[in-house]
A protein has these predicted regions:
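Pore- and gate-forming transmembrane helices of large, multi-pass membrane proteins
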Residues: 190, 484-504, 523, 573-613, ...
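Small-residue-enriched core segments of transmembrane alpha-helices in multipass membrane transport
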Residues: 12-15, 424, 516-538, 549-556, ...
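Short helical (or helix-break) motifs at transmembrane helix termini and adjacent helical loops
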Residues: 552-573, 594, 631-636, 879-903, ...
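Interfacial segments of transmembrane alpha-helices in multi-pass membrane proteins
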Residues: 3-4, 396-397, 401-418, 422-423, ...
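Interfacial helix-loop-helix hairpins and adjacent transmembrane helices
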Residues: 1-72, 76, 99-108, 114-136, ...
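Hydrophobic alpha-helical transmembrane segments of membrane transport and translocation systems
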Residues: 8, 525, 532-533, 569-585, ...
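Non-transmembrane, solvent-exposed regions of membrane trafficking/translocation machinery
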Residues: 22-31, 51, 55-63, 71-435, ...
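Juxtamembrane "pre-transmembrane" interface segments
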Residues: 216, 444-447, 455-503, 767, ...
Length: 990
């Protein structure tokens, strides 16, 4: 080996750098454990402790010191599946941005294009591109984007803006830039909010130019609070309100009109005695007061007063909103009331007639106008602080600028004179609607009070200070993981990694003896380098990432196996140990096979990295780094010890008594079996396609959208019971499966997954709690059921949501990833082997493997005791199978190419058969180490990745079969008769 000293120098330097980088992870972990001990389960106390020592020196290397914040920045970060917390993807509404840029244009072509873009957006297409396509189709050249009533409006004119003379292509560039600026503005606002929220090491990043923003909050536990914080647009407005006596006649008339379409004769409900029902009591038609005869009024659960029209149950708000949007109801509003805007207040808890605590929400009617503009906008607010009102209750005080102070004085003066109320509205929710009893308020200071707690006022002040979002931000994908579940994942991953390392190391020693020890040392160094690189690049370690590390231990010895097997062959051919080592490490020896196998593997890993997201990207990261470090340690580190052994004149045989005669003089007619293997594989493909057509696949929420909950109970529970209970409240959409132990369920539903905003999320959580709490002992509250906390054992341990548009993007990415990986590998092999027949054989084998795995999943998902969903994890498994199947195939093909170009005697089929037989030890050993580590991961890796590992396990097994019985026979059958005769003539002459 040339430059041995230089390699040793770099290896030692790399090892020292890796240890240095990993030291930060150990120090950070120790400090965090101290914080947990100090907080004793209080997450807020834990965060405050870590914040307080952020600038303190916690790591002294003698020549330099590091603060806790610096140490945290350099550690290996754990993903949410290991740390716990919440991960969301927010979709900034490009539709709202375009409306704003057009000044809410009424142009029919423009608005139809907005609607068409929403309906027809293709997977992986941005909304803006979909809008441009729709506008081109709808306008057909008759309407320009630079029209005065679209984008050539006053607000977009001027330098860098839109003028009337511009073409659509020019306007598109400007609008694209303006949209990017708005998303950037949203990104900045969200970062300000998150920085003040109080979690350690939050992560926020834009996802390409899709208008999507990824937010990760490790360790965050209050789910509903976080979603409110992220989704609030902070659109603060001040509206004048109607009083109940002013709007009461409309409510009466609406109730009468609704009776014609909504009343059910079997419905019997008591009429609540509130101010509205009192109005009704004076009506001439006393029949209206009969129980169950009031579609609108029967839904009132408590009386209102002043600006509050009544209190309703949150579950009825959607129905009532639908009533007020109906044209036949709106027409009942007289005069200026026709512009009235009906909005809800914040949810509070009240006592019903039986004294039971129930949720209630207040209904308000705001004094609207033709342009739907509030009396005052919240843009005048310059500062906001959480404080306490005169009664000592939590509130938020606001300070306005000069213009705002003047407008506020006018507005409060008018309210004082008219004895009316001013509603303080944030994102179409009324937080308070105070009256003005002491005259106009000067100075621009105001206060928001209501049924708040201290946490709510802190968040509200935070949102107002950070500023408003330029458009609505909807959570299109989310995942919530409890810290206890994360600890279980760490334990499972650690156990499987240790056991996998032990088994692989033991096998290498049993099979290769002393040389196996050298491979094991290289494996240990490989793991050090791998973790060192992960720490240095700031990678996030996820559970699939741990699986990638365990797989790396299987692949790390592959190169050693190929080299050792070649060395054994050279020794059997009578060469000296030095000659055998030199040959096996040469391009003519093992290097060509190692290069081709790993390049194909790297290509599929790169595709996985590009198209994957979240944990899957973490898997791809560890896999790619592991391939590179494995190559370095297998080729150079193990070689250093081998050369050291040779220099000491020690014997090295690469075999033990156990393995000495295994696969020696192995002769099997692989090509003679091709008729049977073709028949078997054709039957498998037919069965797979038949099952796919009849049974389909169990597509996960990643591909079809939906909500998934992992819920643990105190004792075993029947899935059918839970399914029947939830189907009643989720409109028939509830799939319930046992997940791991029989007291843990995986519940999937599409109920309201398309509805934006946090209200739908909260409704689903509350419906889950209300319908499942009967299966728990008394004392389980909604907060304990939904939110995460240290030591949580029951309730929702993990929850995820994937919106339908994101699901379509993921599915599109998955198709392109698989097809792209196969195309790239086909091209590489064709270039490397210079014959398309090699590529065809390899791709046919890979396609066979993919179809086989899909067929198994289609046939078995209904009765297997673990999840077999087709999701991002499954696609990662398929791409990994493609890589490893190629690995096996390349080992065989490389020997075939060598023998066909060499002097081996025999017919074409005999030469190819001999090629396959001489690679059996390599093929079986490389596959066996992979199968062993996958089995370990399958048994000990945890329920959440069992289906993912199973796909790889089946794929590796069938991939080994296809390399021997599909790829090579196809290669032989597609080579022309003339080429075969040329080879046979050459070998006879040799």
């Amino acid at each position: 080996m040339q430059n041995k000293g230089l390699i040793k120098f770099f290896a030692i330097l790399f090892a020292l750098v890796s240890i240095y980088q990993l030291s930060f992870t150990f120090v950070a972990s120790k400090v965090k454990n101290d914080a947990k001990s100090f907080a004793n389960g209080d997450s807020e106390k834990e965060v405050k402790y870590l914040d307080s020592i952020g600038k303190e020196k916690v790591f002294n290397l003698g020549f330099t010191n590091f603060t806790f914040n610096e140490v945290s920045d350099k550690q290996i970060n754990k993903g949410l599946d290991l740390e716990g917390g919440i991960n969301v993807i927010l979709q900034i509404s490009v539709k709202d941005i375009l409306k704003g840029l057009s000044n809410n244009s009424k142009n029919p072509v423009f608005n139809k294009s907005l609607a068409d873009a929403t309906a027809n957006k293709k997977g992986n297409q941005t909304y803006l591109d979909a809008f441009f396509d729709a506008f081109d189709a709808n306008s057909n050249g008759t309407v320009k984007l630079a029209s005065p009533d679209i984008f050539a409006n006053r607000s977009l004119q001027g330098e860098g803006g839109v003028d009337f003379q511009m073409t659509d292509a020019q306007v598109k560039k400007i609008i694209s830039r303006k949209v990017d600026e708005s998303v950037e503005s949203a990104f900045g606002v969200l970062r300000k909010r998150i920085d003040k929220f109080g979690v350690t090491q939050p992560n926020i990043q834009k996802l390409g130019n899709s208008g999507q923003i990824l937010v990760e909050l490790p360790g965050a536990k209050d789910v509903d609070r976080i979603k409110k914080l992220l989704q609030s647009t902070a659109q603060l407005e001040f509206w004048e309100t109607y009083k109940i006596e002013e709007i009461g006649n409309f409510i009466m008339a609406a109730n009468e009109s609704l009776k014609k379409t909504e009343i059910k004769t079997t419905e019997v409900k008591p009429v609540v005695k509130d101010s509205l029902s009192a109005l009704l009591a004076d009506a001439k038609d006393t029949a209206v007061a009969k129980k169950g005869n009031n579609p609108l009024l029967d839904k009132i659960i408590a009386q209102g007063g002043g600006p509050v029209l009544g209190l309703f149950s949150p579950k009825d708000t959607a129905v009532i909103n639908g009533y007020f949007k109906r044209a036949d109801i709106r027409i009942l509003l007289a005069g200026d009331q026709r512009y009235a805007k009906f909005v809800w207040g914040i949810t509070s808890t009240i006592k019903d007639e039986k004294g039971k605590a129930v949720d209630a929400v207040e209904l308000y009617a705001l004094r609207g106008n033709r342009d739907n503009i509030p009396a005052m906008s919240g843009g005048v607010v310059t500062d906001a602080k959480d404080t306490f009102d005169q009664l000592g209750k939590p509130a938020v005080s606001m300070q306005m600028d000069g213009q705002g102070a003047k407008s506020w004085e006018e507005l409060t003066g008018r309210a004082y004179t008219q004895k009316s109320n001013i509603a303080i509205v944030l994102d179409d929710v009324v937080y308070s609607a105070p009256g003005v009893s002491s005259g106009p308020i000067s100075g621009g200071r105001s206060e928001i009070s209501g049924a708040f707690d201290v946490t709510q006022t802190k968040d509200l002040a935070n949102v107002l200070r950070a500023g408003k979002l330029p458009a609505a931000a909807d959570i299109v994908q989310s995942e919530v993981v409890g810290p206890s579940l994360g600890q279980e994942a760490i334990d499972n991953g650690t156990n499987s990694a240790i056991l996998g390392l032990f088994i692989v190391s033991l096998w290498m020693m049993i099979y290769y003896g002393k040389a196996g020890w050298f491979a094991n040392i290289a494996l240990a160094v490989n793991l050090l380098f791998l973790f060192g690189i992960l720490a240095s690049i700031g990678a996030v370690l996820t559970l699939p990432g741990i699986a990638g590390i365990v797989l790396t231990m299987g692949t790390a010895v592959d190169a050693n196996i190929i080299i050792y097997e070649r060395a054994k062959e050279e020794l059997r051919a009578g060469r000296t140990l030095e000659e055998a080592i030199k040959t096996s490490y040469s391009w003519r020896g093992a290097m060509s096979s190692i290069t081709d196998a790993n390049v194909t593997h790297i290509l599929t890993g790169a595709v996985l990295f590009i198209f994957g997201s979240g944990p899957i990207k973490g898997f791809a990261t560890t896999l790619l780094i592991g391939i590179i470090t494995s190559l370095f340690t297998s080729i150079f580190i193990a070689r250093i010890f081998i050369d050291w052994n040779i220099n000491r004149k020690n014997d090295l045989t690469f075999v033990t008594k156990f393995s000495k005669n295994i696969f020696t003089n192995f002769h099997f007619n692989f090509l003679g079996m091709k008729k049977w293997t073709y028949l078997i594989s054709i039957c498998i493909v037919i069965i797979s396609f038949t099952s796919l057509a009849i049974n389909g696949l169990d597509e996960g929420t990643d591909f079809v959208g939906g909500r998934t909950f992992q819920i643990r109970f105190e004792k075993p529970i029947e899935t059918e019971t839970v399914k029947a209970e939830l189907e009643k409240v989720f409109d028939g959409s509830a799939e319930v499966k046992v997940f791991g132990s029989d007291n843990q369920l995986k519940i999937t539903t599409k109920y309201k997954v398309q509805e934006p905003g946090i209200q739908a999320d909260e409704e689903v959580n509350k419906l889950l709690f209300e319908n499942l709490k009967q299966h728990y002992s008394a004392g389980l509250t909604y907060d304990k059921f939904v939110n995460a906390y240290d030591g949580k054992k029951v309730g929702i341990l993990q929850a995820s949501k994937v919106g339908p548009t994101v699901a379509e993007d993921i599915k599109t990415n998955a198709y392109w990833a698989v097809l792209g990986a196969m195309a790239i590998v086909f091209l590489y092999l064709m270039i490397s082997y210079r014959k398309w027949q090699y590529s065809l054989g390899a791709i046919a084998a890979v396609a066979h493997d993919v179809i086989f795995v899909l067929g198994i999943y289609s046939l078995c998902y209904k009765f297997m005791p673990f999840g077999m969903e087709i999701d991002q994890h499954f696609i990662a498994a398929i791409l990994t199978v493609i890589g490893y199947s190629m690995n096996d195939t390349v080992i065989v093909f490389d020997r075939v190419r060598e023998y066909l170009a060499g002097k081996t005697k025999g017919t074409f089929a005999e030469i190819v058969n001999q090629s396959i037989n001489t690679t059996m030890s390599r093929t079986i050993n490389t596959s066996l180490t992979m199968i062993v580590v996958l089995l370990i991961m399958f048994v000990f890796g945890g329920e959440s990745i069992r289906g993912f590992i199973f796909a790889m396990l089946i794929g590796i097994i069938v991939g080994t079969y296809s390399s021997l019985f599909i790829a090579t026979p196809i290669l032989v059958d597609t080579i022309s008769k003339e080429d075969k005769e040329k080879v046979e003539i050459t070998h006879k002459e040799a």
